[in-house]
Swiss-Prot record:
<feature type="repeat" description="WD 1">
    <location>
        <begin position="103"/>
        <end position="142"/>
    </location>
</feature>
<dbReference type="InterPro" id="IPR011047">
    <property type="entry name" value="Quinoprotein_ADH-like_sf"/>
</dbReference>
<feature type="repeat" description="WD 8">
    <location>
        <begin position="445"/>
        <end position="476"/>
    </location>
</feature>
<dbReference type="Pfam" id="PF00400">
    <property type="entry name" value="WD40"/>
</dbReference>
<feature type="repeat" description="WD 6">
    <location>
        <begin position="361"/>
        <end position="400"/>
    </location>
</feature>
<feature type="repeat" description="WD 3">
    <location>
        <begin position="189"/>
        <end position="234"/>
    </location>
</feature>
<dbReference type="InterPro" id="IPR020472">
    <property type="entry name" value="G-protein_beta_WD-40_rep"/>
</dbReference>
<dbReference type="Pfam" id="PF08154">
    <property type="entry name" value="NLE"/>
</dbReference>
<dbReference type="InterPro" id="IPR001680">
    <property type="entry name" value="WD40_rpt"/>
</dbReference>
<comment type="similarity">
    <text>Belongs to the NLE1/RSA4 family.</text>
</comment>
<dbReference type="InterPro" id="IPR019775">
    <property type="entry name" value="WD40_repeat_CS"/>
</dbReference>
<dbReference type="InterPro" id="IPR012972">
    <property type="entry name" value="NLE"/>
</dbReference>
<keyword id="KW-0539">Nucleus</keyword>
<feature type="repeat" description="WD 5">
    <location>
        <begin position="311"/>
        <end position="357"/>
    </location>
</feature>
<dbReference type="GO" id="GO:0000027">
    <property type="term" value="P:ribosomal large subunit assembly"/>
</dbReference>
<dbReference type="InterPro" id="IPR015943">
    <property type="entry name" value="WD40/YVTN_repeat-like_dom_sf"/>
</dbReference>
<feature type="region of interest" description="Ubiquitin-like (UBL) domain">
    <location>
        <begin position="5"/>
        <end position="87"/>
    </location>
</feature>
C-alpha cells in the first residue's frame, strides 16, 4: 500500500488579503483543479468562475508541492493561498490575415475598433479617416476634412462618434454609420494634436465631452454638442503627450516637461503634479482604461456580429458604472507612465504624488504602456525590441518578451487578459501568452514597419496598420 502523501494547512484569501473560511488541511500535491472545487464550495457562487491560485506571487500551475519547491515557505505554518477570479470567456489567438485592405495613400498611423467591435476606423498620413465594414471586411467610408496627417483617433464610449486630430491642430467628429462629419471642426489649439480622450460613459452617457492634448502645451475640454471649447488647462511648459479621462472625475496629462498632472475635470483645477521622470513622458495608461473604453459593453456577452449597445442612457450608464466599479475594486485608479528616460513609474494619482514604484529594465525609450483589462498586468513596449510585463498592483518586474528584431511600437491586450499582440518596425505582429510568458504566434504579412495595432473588444479580430499603407485584419 502507498504511504500517505503529506498534508498541509492552507488558508484561502482574496486579492485584498481577506480570508475565506478557516484554515484546513489538504494533500501537499493538490492540483489547481482540486483547489478550484474546494474554493468554489466555500465561495458558494451561483455561477462559479475559473480561478487562478498563488502562493507568494507564484502561480500554482501543476501542483502545490511543485510551487513550494521553488520558494522558501515554512510548511509547518498555515500557507496562504490567494485566489484570483479569471475571465469566464476565452479569446482565441489570431493566426491568419483574413483581409489586406488597401485605400490609404500614405502610412496608416492609427487603427481603433469601436467599443463593441462593430466598427473599425483608421487615421493616416494621407489626411483621411477611413471606416471599414467588418462583416464584409471591405472599405466603408472615407472621411475627408483634415488638411494634414491624422495623428490621433478616439471612439466615444457609446460607439456613436469618432474624434480625429491632425497635425495642423484641428479636431473633427465623425458619424461611423455615414462617414459624415458631425458639426464644425473644433479649432483653438495652435499646434498639432497628440492625443484625444472622451469622458467616461458612467459619468455622462451622452458622450458629450472630449479632451484633447497638444504640442502647444495645453489640454482643452470640448463640448462636442455645442462645438465649443469649455476649458483650457494650462500649466505644462512643453508639449502634452497624452491625456486620460479617469473614472472618478480626474483628468491626467503627461508632458515633455517630465511631469504628469492630475486635474479636476469639472472645473479644470490642477490637483497634483507628479514628478520623477528624468526626461519626456511619452505615454501613460490607467488601470481602468479598458473598462472606460468599452463602457456598457461586456466582452463576455459578445455576439458573432457585433452590434451597438441598445438601451436607454440611464440603463447604459448603470451598466457602465457597475463594470467600472468591479474593475476598479477597492483601491483608487492606478496610473503608469513611460518615458524617454527608459523607466516607467506606477502612481495612485488620486491619493498621492509620490510614485508607488519606479520600474527599470528597458534599455531604450518606451513607446507604449498598457494595463491588462483585468488590471493585473502592465505591458510596456520599447525601442529596445522587447515587451516587458510587470505586476499591475506593485509594479514588480515579471518577465521580458523577446522575439522582435527591431523597435516595438504598439501593443494591445485581448479582452480576457490572457493574450497580448505587438506591432513592430520589423514588419511583424506577434501574439504572446501572458500566462506562460511565451510567444504563441508570429504574424508576418506587412511589407514595412507596423505603427498601430488594436484587438477588438469582442475578441474576434486584430487590426494593424503601418508604413505599407495597408490595413490588415487578423482572425483565429
Amino acid at each position: 500500500m502507498k504511504e500517505d502523501v503529506g498534508r498541509l494547512l492552507i488558508q484561502f484569501k482574496n486579492e485584498n488579503g481577506e480570508g475565506l473560511g478557516t484554515p484546513f488541511d489538504v494533500p501537499v500535491d493538490i492540483t489547481p483543479d482540486k483547489l478550484q472545487l474546494v474554493c468554489n464550495a466555500l465561495l458558494q457562487e451561483e455561477d462559479p468562475v475559473p480561478l487562478a491560485f498563488f502562493v507568494q506571487d507564484l502561480e500554482i500551475v501543476t501542483s502545490l508541492d511543485k510551487t513550494l519547491e521553488k520558494q522558501s515557505v515554512e510548511t509547518e505554518k498555515v500557507i496562504d493561498i490567494i485566489y484570483q477570479p479569471q475571465a469566464v470567456f476565452k479569446v482565441r489567438a489570431v493566426t491568419r490575415c483574413t483581409s489586406s485592405l488597401e485605400g490609404h495613400t500614405e502610412a496608416v498611423i492609427s487603427v481603433a475598433f469601436s467599443p463593441t467591435g462593430k466598427y473599425l476606423a483608421s487615421g493616416s498620413g494621407d489626411t483621411t479617416v477611413r471606416f471599414w465594414d467588418l462583416s464584409t471586411e471591405t472599405p466603408h467610408f472615407t472621411s475627408k476634412g483634415h488638411t494634414h496627417w491624422v495623428l490621433s483617433i478616439a471612439w466615444s464610449p457609446d460607439g456613436k462618434k469618432l474624434a480625429s486630430g491632425c497635425k495642423n491642430s484641428q479636431i473633427f467628429i465623425w458619424d461611423p454609420s455615414t462617414g459624415k462629419q458631425i458639426g464644425k471642426p473644433l479649432t483653438g489649439h495652435s499646434k498639432w494634436i497628440t492625443w484625444l480622450c472622451w469622458e467616461p460613459l458612467h459619468l455622462n452617457p451622452e458622450s458629450r465631452y472630449l479632451a484633447s492634448a497638444s504640442k502647444d502645451c495645453t489640454i482643452r475640454i470640448w463640448d462636442t454638442v455645442m462645438g465649443q471649447c469649455q476649458k483650457i488647462l494650462t500649466s505644462h511648459t512643453q508639449s502634452v503627450t497624452a491625456v486620460k479621462w479617469g473614472g472618478d472625475g480626474l483628468l491626467y496629462s503627461s508632458s515633455q516637461d517630465r511631469t504628469i498632472k492630475a486635474w479636476r475635470a469639472q472645473d479644470g483645477v490642477l490637483c497634483r503634479t507628479l514628478q520623477g521622470h528624468a526626461h519626456w513622458v511619452n505615454t501613460m495608461a490607467l488601470s481602468t482604461d479598458y473598462v472606460l473604453r468599452t463602457g456598457a459593453f461586456n466582452p463576455a456577452d459578445a455576439s458573432v456580429n457585433p452590434q451597438d449597445m441598445s438601451g436607454s442612457l440611464e440603463v447604459l450608464k448603470e451598466k457602465a458604472l457597475k463594470r467600472y466599479n468591479e474593475v476598479r475594486g477597492q483601491g483608487p485608479e492606478r496610473l503608469v507612465s513611460g518615458s524617454d528616460d527608459f523607466t516607467l513609474f506606477l502612481w495612485a494619482p488620486a491619493e498621492e504624488k509620490k510614485p508607488l514604484q519606479r520600474m527599470t529594465g528597458h534599455q531604450a525609450l518606451i513607446n507604449e504602456v498598457l494595463f491588462s483589462p483585468d488590471t493585473r498586468i502592465i505591458a510596456s513596449a520599447s525601442f529596445d525590441k522587447s515587451i516587458k510585463l510587470w505586476d499591475g498592483k506593485t509594479g514588480k518586474f515579471l518577465t521580458s518578451l523577446r522575439g522582435h528584431v527591431s523597435a516595438v511600437y504598439q501593443i494591445a491586450w485581448s479582452a480576457d487578459s490572457r493574450l497580448l499582440v505587438s506591432g513592430s518596425s520589423d514588419s511583424t505582429l506577434k501574439v504572446w501568452d501572458s500566462k506562460t510568458k511565451k510567444l504563441l504566434i508570429d504574424l508576418p504579412g506587412h511589407a514595412d514597419e507596423v505603427y498601430s495595432v488594436d484587438w477588438s473588444p469582442d475578441g474576434q479580430r486584430v487590426a494593424s496598420g503601418g508604413k505599407d499603407k495597408c490595413l490588415r485584419i487578423w482572425r483565429k
